[in-house]
Amino acid sequence: MNADLTVVSPQIQAQILAEALPYIRKFHGKTIVVKYGGNAMTEERLKHSFARDVILLKLVGMNPVVVHGGGPQIDNALKKIGKQGTFIQGMRITDEETMEVVEWVLGGEVQQDIVMLINHYGGQAVGLTGKDGGLIRARKMNMPDRENPGKFLDIGFVGDIEAINPAVVKALQDDAFIPIISPIGFGDDGQAYNINADVVAGKIAEILRAEKLIMMTNIAGVQDKQGNLLTDLSAREIDEMFEDGTISGGMLPKISSALDAAKSGVNTVHIIDGRIEHSLLLEVLTEQAFGTMIRSH
C-alpha cells in the first residue's frame, strides 16, 4: 500500500478506501495493541510511516496502544561503555550497569523518539514506563535451567510481570491520547526490572481485552525448519515447534506471549513483517493475508 495517494489514480484511491471501510467499522472503538520493534524502529522511512499509521488508526476510531522494544539501541549504548549484550533463551542478562542503560535508552531515547514522531504528524502520544500510575508491577525472574531441571538461572534484573494496572492507559485512551509503553517494570521496593517487550505487549493486550495483538518483527512471520512461512499456527503446532527446536532464541518469548494472549481472550494475534512499509495498516485495514496468525486451539 502506498501512503502517498497523490501518485495513484482517483479510482485506486477510492478502491483503497472502500476496502478499508468494513475493517474501520469492525474495529471502531476497539483496542489494538502493537509490539513495535526491529527495523521498523531503526530505519527512518519505516519510523515515519509507522507514526502515520498509528495516527490513522486513532483517527478512524480505534484505540492503538504501542509497546516498544529497543534491543539494537541498547546494544549500541552498551558498546559505547565497553559492554556486550548477552542473552539466554531470548532474555538479556541484565546486571546493575546494564539496567541503568536499559532505563535511559528505553524510557528516554527510544520512547521519546516515538512520542515526538507521532506528535510531529499531528497525533497525541504520551510515553509511559511501568512506574507511571503503577502500570507494571514486577518481581525478579527465576529462569528455569533447561540443562538442570529443578534449578534456576540468575540473569540479573530481568523481571516477571506480577500485575498490570491498566487505569492510566484507559485514562489516556478516554482522553484521545496514544499510550507509548516502555517495557520496564518496578518492584514493591522501587527496583527497576527489564522485561521482554513481547511479554509486556501480550499481558497488556490481555488486561485491556484487546481486539488485536500485532507483533512487528524482522522476518515475514514464523517459519518452519526449511524457512517456509507458516501463515497459521495452533497451540498444538507451537508446542511441537518448541519441542523440536524450530522455535528458539528471541522467538521463544515472542511466540509464548502471543499464544498466552490468544488463550486469554485476545481475539486475533498476528506476527508480521515490520520491514514492509505500512505493514500495520495492511494487517488491520485490508483483506491481505499477512504474517502468521496464532490460534489458541
Swiss-Prot record:
Q: Which UniProt keywords apply?
A: Amino-acid biosynthesis, Arginine biosynthesis, ATP-binding, Cytoplasm, Kinase, Nucleotide-binding, Transferase
- Span-the-membrane segments of this chain are none
Predominant cellular place of this UniProt entry's protein? cytoplasm
Cellular localization per UniProt = Cytoplasm
UniProt EC number: 2.7.2.8
- Asked if Signal is a keyword of the record, the answer is no
What is an example of a Pfam family matching this protein? Answer: AA_kinase
Instruction: Report which reactions are catalysed by this protein.
Output: N-acetyl-L-glutamate + ATP = N-acetyl-L-glutamyl 5-phosphate + ADP
- Enumerate the Gene3D superfamilies for this protein: Acetylglutamate kinase-like
Check the record and name the HAMAP family matching this protein: ArgB
Family the entry assigns: Belongs to the acetylglutamate kinase family. ArgB subfamily.
Task: Spell out the NCBIfam families in the cross-references.
Answer: argB
- In Swiss-Prot or TrEMBL terms, this protein is called Acetylglutamate kinase
